[in-house]
Swiss-Prot record:
Catalytic activity: an aldehyde + NAD(+) + H2O = a carboxylate + NADH + 2 H(+)
Keywords carried by this UniProt record: NAD, Oxidoreductase
Lineage: Bacteria, Pseudomonadati, Pseudomonadota, Gammaproteobacteria, Moraxellales
Keyword flag Oxidoreductase: yes
Name of this protein: Aldehyde dehydrogenase
Length: 23
């Protein structure tokens, strides 16, 4: 659940990673 992680949303790299994982 990376997309549910607040730390991932705060980080620009994590933001793109959460989207990459979603797709």
């Amino acid at each position: 659940m990376l997309y549910a992680n607040p730390n991932t949303e705060s980080s620009p790299v994590g933001f793109r990673k959460k989207y990459d994982n979603f797709i």
